[in-house]
């Protein structure tokens, strides 16, 4: 009798722990999605505008080529960061679903 109750309590505790972990993972996924969206909708367009403006100034022979390369590099690095973040997001979603259906 006590053994069965103990096992039931242990099972309940494990379920609560798993549920808490899943809620935590859900929150992480949502916050990462928001961060990626902000990067795609705000940061990358701003870097693209900076690059375009820098390139125009370069075409007018007012700045040197390294400034244009720096602006291009900043934009490209941010695009790479977004791709890295998306990879992490997709891996997190896979882990979440594995845990959910375990």
Language model features: what each stretch is:
Residues 2-81, 88-99:
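Amphipathic alpha-helical coiled-coil segments
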């Amino acid at each position: 009798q006590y053994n069965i109750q103990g096992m039931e309590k242990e099972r309940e505790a494990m379920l609560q722990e798993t549920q808490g972990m899943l809620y935590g993972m859900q929150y992480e996924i949502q916050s990462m999605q928001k961060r990626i969206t902000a990067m795609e909708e705000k940061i990358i367009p701003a870097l693209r505008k900076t690059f375009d403006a820098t390139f125009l100034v370069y075409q007018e022979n007012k700045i040197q080529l390294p400034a244009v390369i720096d602006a291009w590099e900043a934009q490209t690095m941010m695009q790479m960061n977004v791709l890295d973040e998306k990879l992490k997001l997709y891996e997190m979603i896979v882990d979440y679903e594995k845990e959910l259906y375990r």
